[in-house]
């Protein structure tokens, strides 16, 4: 189950390629613009490799390091810990084929903030197991995060729905392995 934290903050997670197509720079720009509002309420965990130079420069330039934690490339053990620590998986892709990291997050019963592109529409149902926003729409992204900060009671139900939906995609053998993690 999830690792309980007592810092009263919402832990958001992104795991994937650090690449503008994955929407990660949209997230950072959204956070820079709304820093006053968000910096004491969330922690954003990032795992993955790619254009880390641009990312780190942006984080420094906008002084976001107090609430953004970059974990570098994460192996399976580290990734599992991040999935268990997170409250929400945020993956607002501009382009996506299937969204395997989203499915993985769903198997850990995480609510998802994503975009209705590619195969994601099969995974995330708006207001059921997460919130869908328009690709590149930073205002909607901010509103989705704000909504979940203000209504944390939705997190467990959305997470539960994510887990149920994930089961449809996982063959029973994998599901058993996930149960034993």
Please tell me what each predicted stretch does.
Residues 15, 43-56, 72:
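Glycosyltransferase donor-sugar binding loop
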Residues 111-114, 124:
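Short hydrophobic beta-strand element within catalytic cores of glycosyltransferases
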Residues 94:
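Aromatic "clamp/platform" in nucleotide-sugar-dependent glycosyltransferases that forms part
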Residues 140, 147, 154-168:
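A short, well-ordered alpha-helix in the C-terminal region of glycosyltransferases
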Residues 4-22, 28-31, 45:
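Conserved donor-binding/catalytic core segment of Leloir-type glycosyltransferases
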Residues 56-74:
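Nucleotide-activated donor-binding/catalytic signature segment of Leloir-type glycosyltransferases, i.e.
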Residues 126-127, 131-138, 147-152:
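Conserved acidic donor-binding segment of nucleotide-sugar-dependent glycosyltransferases
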Residues 73-74, 81-86:
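Short alpha-helical donor nucleotide-sugar binding micro-motif in glycosyltransferases
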